[in-house]
Amino acid sequence: MAMSLEVFEKLEAKVQQAIDTITLLQMEIEELKEKNNSLAQDVQSAQHQREELERENNHLKEQQSGWQDRLQALLGRMEEV
C-alpha cells in the first residue's frame, strides 16, 4: 500500500510538473504571438512608407524632367539670339 502511495505521489508530481511546463509554454506562445503581430504591423507600416516614398520620388522625377525640358527650351532660345 505504501509503495503504491509513493508511486502515486511521484506520478502526481510529474503531472504537476508537466502542467507547469505546459502553462509556461502557453505563456511563451502568447508572448511570441504578440511579438509576431507587432512585427507584422511594423512590416506593414514600412511597406506603406516605402510606397509613399516611391510616389514622392516619381513626382520629383517628373518635376525634374519638366524643369530640364524648360531649361533646354530656354537654352535653345538663348542660342537663337
Swiss-Prot record:
GO terms for cellular component: cytoplasm. Residues 38-47 have a biased composition (Polar residues). Residues 6-80 form a coiled coil. It holds the Pfam family ZapB. It is found in: Cytoplasm. Residues 38-67 are annotated as: Disordered. Keywords: Cell cycle, Cell division, Coiled coil, Cytoplasm, Septation. GO terms for biological process: division septum assembly; FtsZ-dependent cytokinesis. Residues 48-62 have a biased composition (Basic and acidic residues). Belongs to the ZapB family. Homodimer. The ends of the coiled-coil dimer bind to each other, forming polymers. Interacts with FtsZ. Non-essential, abundant cell division factor that is required for proper Z-ring formation. It is recruited early to the divisome by direct interaction with FtsZ, stimulating Z-ring assembly and thereby promoting cell division earlier in the cell cycle. Its recruitment to the Z-ring requires functional FtsA or ZipA. This is Cell division protein ZapB. The lineage of its organism: Bacteria, Pseudomonadati, Pseudomonadota, Gammaproteobacteria, Enterobacterales.
